[in-house]
Amino acid sequence: MNGGICPTCGLPKELCICEEVAKEQQRISVKINRRRYGKEVTVIEGLDPYDIDLEDLSKFLKAKLACGGTVKDSSIELQGNHRERVKDLLAQKGYNMENIS
């Protein structure tokens, strides 16, 4: 049990800025892929699975966008075309808007 200590930097969780630094440095791409029967899937790539909890981010996005989705490798797939709304939500979560394409 860590007792509130960040495993990356060793600081208490209240003082840890590891996740904020990781959010600022990542280059994220948001693309639309077509699947079978003409279904569209929004794919978010460029996220580092070691610095950011992809499951937690995926859960947040699925709840805000009211859609289904999954985490595959180091990308998040959301059902439907949500490109612009995903960019806004990522910026709201603290990601640098200039690094989202």
From Swiss-Prot:
GO terms for molecular function: mRNA binding; translation initiation factor activity. Coiled coil: none annotated. Keywords: Protein biosynthesis, Translation regulation. It comes from the Archaea. Gene3D superfamilies: SUI1-like domain. GO terms for biological process: formation of translation preinitiation complex; regulation of translation; translation reinitiation. Pfam families: SUI1. SUPFAM superfamilies: eIF1-like. The keyword Transcription does not apply. Belongs to the SUI1 family. PANTHER family: DENSITY-REGULATED PROTEIN, DENSITY-REGULATED PROTEIN HOMOLOG. This is Protein translation factor SUI1 homolog.
